[in-house]
């Protein structure tokens, strides 16, 4: 290059060519200028100094008409030469120029040709050339950090840059679904070239590639990248130690702010702890951010990941002896969280399940010596965690505590004191128990043999001695065969019933005495079975002994293991309530807060009140219709077939019947609501003593389960009283009660609170909302919005959203605010 004041021949030549391209309309001159620029591509000075300006002139020349006004042969040659300059030029400068031109150019032929040029650039594998040029140690030594950051940003955000300007006209290759796998394939090619260069004794740098990978992942496209990178890297690093080191170096050079997104995407794409160990090496020991992500964030702060990721992370910590101290550190942290009662109350069930899986996996990966070292901490974790979970009102949390407690006590191998619980099995419990099985961390999951095949014992071949021995038995001769009863048709005894010694009671008082008898089991069972029918048929007799009968049923115990005892008892209690409403309901609501009742009895009272109110609110139907005349005697086995053919014949008649006109549809006959006049008897007495703690019952204290059920029952009673005159007073009283417990720590109680609020907004007339609740509506709305956004329980959040929608709907209808058109 010449000194200041003099111009080099190359610069003069390039300036002449660019002037010709900008101003000339002669196709021959244009072709000659393009050929000259083609020859200059091999000159290092041209690529360093003049290529960017030349490319800008070429792109801007597209707005002129030298393509369309030339002869066909010249036009084809010009397009070919122009494409060669795009492809053979420095990839980095070409990419930046094309993207900047697309971003600054309006709709025109020039924009279309720039888009075509960028498509050509990507299809010609120029991304690989760009990345490899940055890996060579001498390739990027003179570039400024600002230029490097610009190139990385354009590489990572190419889909966003193009789609923001092209909108629906964006080519498919620019979309994330195609571009990022293409970029990932280019990274794989670059890593391959790096391995070859290192084997040849040349130095390489992976810093630029690591920054590109981190930039893409932090923008949210890690899954698209590692769908291509993960499986391929896992495969090639099994036998190639150099490739392992190159991949580990790639991960080490990822910027700290991008570490989490890169590590998470990588682990999700791999299929085993061994693959993670090959690709990451001891990154968890040398990088503090990676250590925080792997030992804390992915395990304790996030819970959306699949179980496979937990297995990979914890297996990665366990597969190498230098990383096993971190596994014990993780176990200690998980134990502290799992036995923390505050965490049980303030975290969602899904996160507690995730932490429980992590705890079981950690324990399964420890050897016996490590178990003995951590035995005391694990024992405290087991006892504290099981206790606080058994105190929960959420069934999933209780069962989770039982399963984990059993697994931990079995692993600790405490002689004579292993925990054992009774619970129903489901898929979640089966998954938790399966985590305690021995985990193979030295092989990838896809390389392990099928467990179902390897664990099955070989079938035992047994000689058919039984049939032969029977045939050769000397005791079974011809005489025994002649005397056999096998040819006789057995008598059908399926419909036989056991003959009862006692007859079922026919009067209400006899039924009551039968339930009170403690020495005759058969009489007790018969009395309980017919109790509901007798109570509903004999109204007068029932009303005479309704309170006494209610007392007997409330204290009734299943002394004889009667079939369907709970349902028969509950049905009888409901029948008493709907038959003699006021005295029985007064008895239920009074005894609910009385002393010396178990929680089960109090819950039974709430269930009976809810079922009775539901029955009273439904229309009365004639359940006992007269017997239909018998037209023919039908064998038992043919009744279903005849009914089936009757339906077919009726359908055929209906389909072939022609109707000239249809009569007026009869309106639904109005029937009185039996619940509306007595709704107050069910509802208001339940508020009588809720804030008065007793020796055996503290509703606002430790008896969270009853409080949650009470709130659900009050909400149901409120909803069934819709259109009743007393519904506004009920809504006001229920909201006052809810307001006192709206910040309760128990999830069951908060669900009941949300259910009750929904019931209020569903049942109260909209015109009464502003009148009765005007002062508290805004505060209630702010509270519901906070619950919908930040509550740890998904059901509470869902109910809060529904309550907000109902409130807004009622207020809009009352204030007559039209919906905004979108």
UniProtKB/Swiss-Prot annotation:
GO terms for biological process: 'de novo' cotranslational protein folding; liver regeneration. The keyword Cytoplasm applies. Pfam families: TELO2_ARM, Telomere_reg-2. The keyword Cytoplasm applies. Keywords: Cytoplasm, Membrane, Nucleus. Residues 442-504 are annotated as: Disordered. Residues 480-489 have a biased composition (Acidic residues). GO terms for cellular component: cytosol; membrane; nucleus. Residues 465-477 have a biased composition (Polar residues). InterPro entries: TEL2_C_sf (IPR038528), TEL2_Regulation (IPR051970), Telomere_length_regulation_dom (IPR019337). It is found in: Cytoplasm; Membrane; Nucleus. Belongs to the TEL2 family. Regulator of the DNA damage response (DDR). Part of the TTT complex that is required to stabilize protein levels of the phosphatidylinositol 3-kinase-related protein kinase (PIKK) family proteins. Promotes assembly, stabilizes and maintains the activity of TORC complexes, which regulate cell growth and survival in response to nutrient and hormonal signals. May be involved in telomere length regulation. This is Telomere length regulation protein TEL2 homolog. It comes from Danio rerio (Zebrafish). The lineage of its organism: Eukaryota, Metazoa, Chordata, Craniata, Vertebrata. The gene is telo2.
């Amino acid at each position: 290059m010449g000194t200041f004041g003099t111009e080099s021949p190359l610069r003069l030549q390039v300036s002449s060519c660019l002037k010709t391209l900008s101003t000339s309309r002669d196709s021959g001159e244009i072709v000659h200028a393009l050929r000259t620029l083609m020859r200059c591509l091999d000159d290092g000075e041209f690529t360093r100094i003049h290529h960017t300006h030349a490319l800008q002139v070429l792109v801007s020349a597209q707005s002129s008409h030298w393509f369309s006004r030339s002869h066909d042969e010249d036009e084809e040659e010009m397009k070919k030469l122009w494409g060669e300059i795009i492809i053979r030029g420095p990839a980095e400068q070409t990419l930046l120029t094309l993207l900047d031109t697309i971003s600054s150019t309006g709709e025109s032929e020039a924009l279309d040709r720039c888009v075509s040029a960028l498509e050509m650039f990507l299809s010609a594998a120029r991304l690989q050339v760009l990345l490899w040029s940055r890996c060579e140690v001498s390739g990027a030594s003179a570039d400024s950090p600002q230029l490097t950051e610009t190139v990385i940003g354009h590489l990572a955000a190419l889909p966003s840059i193009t789609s923001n300007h092209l909108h629906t006209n964006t080519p498919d290759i620019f979309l994330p679904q195609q571009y990022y796998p293409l970029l990932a394939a280019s990274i794989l090619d670059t890593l391959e070239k790096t391995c070859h260069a290192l084997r040849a004794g040349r130095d390489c740098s992976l810093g630029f590639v690591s920054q590109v990978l981190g930039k893409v992942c932090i923008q949210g496209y890690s899954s698209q990248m590692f769908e291509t990178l993960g499986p391929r890297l896992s495969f090639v690093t099994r036998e190639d130690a150099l490739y392992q080191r190159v991949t580990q170096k790639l991960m080490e050079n990822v910027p700290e702010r991008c570490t989490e997104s890169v590590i998470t995407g990588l682990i999700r794409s791999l299929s085993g702890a061994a693959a993670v160990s090959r690709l990451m090496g001891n990154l968890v020991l040398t990088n503090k951010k990676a250590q925080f992500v792997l030992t804390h964030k992915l395990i304790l702060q996030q819970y959306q990941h699949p179980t496979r990721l937990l297995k990979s992370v914890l297996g990665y910590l366990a597969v190498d002896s230098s990383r096993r101290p971190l596994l014990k550190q993780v176990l200690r942290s998980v134990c502290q969280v799992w036995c923390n009662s505050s965490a049980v109350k303030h975290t969602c069930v899904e996160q507690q399940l995730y932490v429980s899986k992590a705890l079981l996996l950690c324990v399964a990966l420890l050897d016996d010596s490590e178990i003995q070292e951590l035995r005391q901490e694990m024992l405290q974790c087991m006892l504290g965690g099981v206790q606080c979970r058994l105190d929960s009102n959420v069934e999933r949390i209780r069962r989770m505590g039982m399963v984990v407690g059993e697994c931990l006590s079995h692993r600790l191998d405490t002689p004579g004191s292993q925990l054992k619980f009774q619970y129903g099995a489901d898929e979640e419990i089966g998954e938790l128990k399966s985590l305690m099985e021995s985990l193979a961390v030295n092989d990838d999951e896809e390389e392990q043999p099928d467990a179902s095949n390897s664990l099955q014992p070989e079938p035992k071949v047994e000689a058919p001695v039984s049939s032969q021995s029977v045939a050769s038995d000397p005791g079974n001769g011809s005489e025994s065969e002649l005397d056999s009863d096998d040819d006789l048709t057995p008598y059908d005894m399926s419909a036989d019933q056991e003959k009862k010694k006692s007859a079922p009671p026919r009067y209400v008082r006899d039924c009551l005495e039968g339930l009170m008898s403690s020495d005759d089991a058969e009489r007790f069972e018969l009395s309980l079975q017919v109790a509901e029918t007798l109570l509903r048929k004999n109204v007068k007799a029932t009303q005479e002994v309704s309170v006494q009968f209610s007392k007997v049923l409330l204290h009734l115990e299943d002394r004889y293991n009667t079939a369907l005892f709970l349902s028969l008892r509950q049905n009888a209690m409901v029948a008493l309530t709907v038959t003699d409403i006021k005295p029985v309901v007064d008895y239920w609501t009074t005894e609910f807060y009385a002393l010396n009742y178990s929680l089960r009895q109090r819950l039974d009272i709430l269930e009976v009140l809810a079922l009775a109110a539901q029955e009273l609110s439904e229309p009365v139907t004639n359940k006992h219709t007269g017997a239909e005349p018998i037209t023919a005697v039908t064998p038992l086995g043919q009744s279903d077939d005849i009914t089936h053919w009757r339906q077919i014949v009726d359908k055929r008649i209906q389909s072939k019947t022609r109707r000239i006109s249809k009569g007026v549809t009869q309106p639904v006959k109005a029937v009185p609501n039996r619940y509306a006049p007595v709704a107050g008897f069910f509802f208001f007495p339940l508020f009588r003593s809720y804030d008065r703690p007793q020796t055996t019952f503290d509703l606002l204290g430790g008896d969270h389960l009853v409080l949650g059920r009470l709130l659900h029952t009050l909400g149901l009673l409120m909803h069934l009283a819709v259109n009743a005159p007393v519904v506004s007073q009920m809504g006001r009283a229920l909201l006052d009660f809810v307001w006192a417990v709206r910040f309760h720590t128990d999830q069951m109680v908060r669900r009941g609170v949300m259910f009750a609020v929904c019931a209020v907004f569903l049942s109260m007339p909209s015109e009464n909302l502003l009148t009765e609740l005007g002062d508290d509506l805004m505060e209630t709305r702010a509270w519901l919005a906070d619950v919908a956004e930040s509550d740890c329980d998904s059901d509470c959040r869902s109910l809060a959203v529904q309550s907000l929608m109902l409130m807004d709907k009622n207020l809009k209808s009352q204030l007559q605010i039209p919906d905004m058109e979108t």
